[in-house]
Amino acid sequence: MNETVDGEYQAYKARGGKYTRDEFFGKYEQTKKMVASMSDEDISRLNRGGHDPHKVYAAYHQAVNQDNGKPTVILAKTVKGYGMGEAGEGQNITHQQKKMAEDALKEFRDRFEIPIADDKIADAPFYKPEEDSEEMQYLHARRKELGGYLPQRRTEGDKLQIPELSAFDKLLQGSGDREMATTMVFTRILQILTRDKNIKDRIVPIIPDEARTFGMEGMFRSLGIYSPVGQLFVPEDSDQLAFYKEAKDGQILEEGITEAGAISSFIAAATSYSNHGTTMIPFYAFYSMFGFQRVGDFCWAAGDMRARGFMLGGTAGRTTINGEGLQHQDGHSHVMFDCVPNCKAYDPTFSYEMAVIIHRGLVEMYQEQRDVYYYITICLLYTSPSPRDKRQSRMPSSA
């Protein structure tokens, strides 16, 4: 069996017992003798493990009762178009088969012992067991345990008490003569939110490895990086204020260099309001182009699932981080995100813009219960005026 590839197994089912006898069992004299007393029909009816209810039950029973703390994989060998007989069993045409002829339906019925009369078989009716049957009682019990007969989706989460815009007052006042990057502004906003008594436990900062690039390492000490096993080593920067601190109760998800894993965490938190009835506020910060290239399809998936949260595209801009190659040149990420119908894309320049946009997003998603998520680019380094400051902001000498 270990010498046989999947395509051959498919052919054995499609071409019947004689072919299987010659091509599979006939390879070796020992295996040929094993089926010498069996007819071709007997051989064609040899079942695969994935269709054997006893084997499937035994496999799941062993899987759920193992107490070793490890996941269990069940490899089930099955047959394409199982039960269709000559109409499609083991054949590639199964995928295009829209209906079965009456003779094929009768063969299917007889094979699986479905009690449908000959005069009704042409209509291919559904078979429903009696209400007091063991099968129906089992199905009703399972639906009751699952919470009802129809799948349903929560459209509203618990409404959160969002802080007033005045909570960001220092950022609304501008930076005076000091240059301030929008990356730093975002980090300060995140720090304000994680100190707010009403929503601090709902904030989920997510970073795929680039925390220091985005200036977010200052949050390591106060929030900690989540690790299910805690800190297992002494960080080389342990003597510094912003050292790499892991903790079982850490709040930051620093996933390592895996954008796919990080955005999966984002989607899980962003849909928690619907799936679990607990509203979370994820902030997923990544390289706006390098990171986007690895999660583009997930961004659409987030929209399809009505995710709510913030995605932050760091080191944005066409010439920001050229030293690491063309893969980082971002002059179009907003165009890509704008293609997702329920994603709102912004490119703020000044600190007050960043504060207003994020505050508006919090209100829109977590009070008004709108099914949108925000994409905001962060990078620009300017002197930031206040909204009422009519002075022209000075471009930095490095611009």
Predicted regions mapped to residue ranges:
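Thiamine diphosphate
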Residues: 31-50, 54-58, 124-380, 394-398
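A detector of low-complexity, intrinsically disordered, Ser/Thr/Gly/Pro/Ala-rich segments
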Residues: 92, 391-393
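Active-site catalytic microenvironments for nucleophilic, acid-base chemistry
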Residues: 111, 272, 386
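Long, well-ordered, tryptophan-enriched scaffold segments
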Residues: 1-173
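Conserved small/polar residues in nucleotide/adenosyl-binding loops
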Residues: 382-389
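Accessible peptide chain termini
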Residues: 1-3, 384, 397
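Phosphate/oxyanion-binding loops and surfaces in catalytic or ligand/nucleic-acid-binding neighborhoods
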Residues: 111-115, 364, 390
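Short, acidic Gly/Pro/Ser/Thr-rich loop/turn segments
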Residues: 81-82, 115, 212-213, 319, ...
